[in-house]
Amino acid sequence: MDSAVDRHVFYISDGTAITAEVLGHAVMSQFPVTISSITLPFVENESRARAVKDQIDAIYHQTGVRPLVFYSIVLPEIRAIILQSEGFCQDIVQALVAPLQQEMKLDPTPIAHRTHGLTPGNLNKYDARIAAIDYTLAHDDGISLRNLDQAQVILLGVSRCGKTPTSLYLAMQFGIRAANYPFIADDMDNLVLPASLKPLQHKLFGLTINPERLAAIREERRENSRYASLRQCRMEVAEVEALYRKNQIPWINSTNYSVEEIATKILDIMGLNRRMY
């Protein structure tokens, strides 16, 4: 086994494997181990299942340690092949379905690809999410100020504080139409809320970041530039935070938060509907 890896972890599904990955990562994050992740989506036939089993077994025979296997598979014949492997296998969906089946006194009707696949029942939701992504891309970094009234949230902040990835995550994960507007160095001499944003103040949300972190990020983009200097970063952050306070714009410091955490905080603070797809 690689000395830097404590366990090999498989995420296996007859669909996208997103559910297996999300739940598996959540579980593994509770343990102080270094993992090597292997995601195998669309394991839909016995031939592919046997190849996956062989891959699991090969790692076991190579390392002497059972790989951990998080799986979500509908067809019993495919599950049976995976369960014959040398891995420690956990059915992440059935672990929850079984007690719910007993509580609700209902039999489940498992269908492959139901969670992240397209069906007549979720097509409208899917179209709405794609429309949100299109809107967010068209309104990234102040590219367009048209139709800003259609935004559900407008993120503000200095360059490289996390506006774009947060906007895209909100659109892709939750179907939120998120615009974002940058404050640049030229704005700092007389930083005011742009006239186009004043009527939409109830949709504004600010991001800030520690100047030291901002300087490090900018240094990777423009080495040894005024743009990346700590002095410039301190000045810009101070000016923008003063603007937030003056205009009573809610804001958070993104320095120690992941994109997922930032987006979730925005949804909570702004009272936006959290839609899952």
Swiss-Prot record:
- One Gene Ontology term from the biological process aspect of the record: regulation of DNA-templated transcription
EC number assigned by the record: 2.7.11.33, 2.7.4.28
Gene Ontology molecular function: ADP binding; ATP binding; DNA binding; phosphotransferase activity, phosphate group as acceptor; protein serine/threonine kinase activity
- Lineage: superkingdom: Bacteria
Keyword Flavoprotein listed: no
- Transmembrane spans: none
Keywords of the record: Kinase, Nucleotide-binding, Serine/threonine-protein kinase, Transferase
Among HAMAP family, the record links this protein to: PSRP
As for what it does, the entry says: Bifunctional serine/threonine kinase and phosphorylase involved in the regulation of the phosphoenolpyruvate synthase (PEPS) by catalyzing its phosphorylation/dephosphorylation.
UniProt lists the family membership as follows: Belongs to the pyruvate, phosphate/water dikinase regulatory protein family. PSRP subfamily.
- Please state what the protein is called: Phosphoenolpyruvate synthase regulatory protein
What is the species listed in this Swiss-Prot or TrEMBL entry?
Answer: Escherichia fergusonii (strain ATCC 35469 / DSM 13698 / CCUG 18766 / IAM 14443 / JCM 21226 / LMG 7866 / NBRC 102419 / NCTC 12128 / CDC 0568-73)
The lineage, from the top, is:
Bacteria, Pseudomonadati, Pseudomonadota, Gammaproteobacteria, Enterobacterales
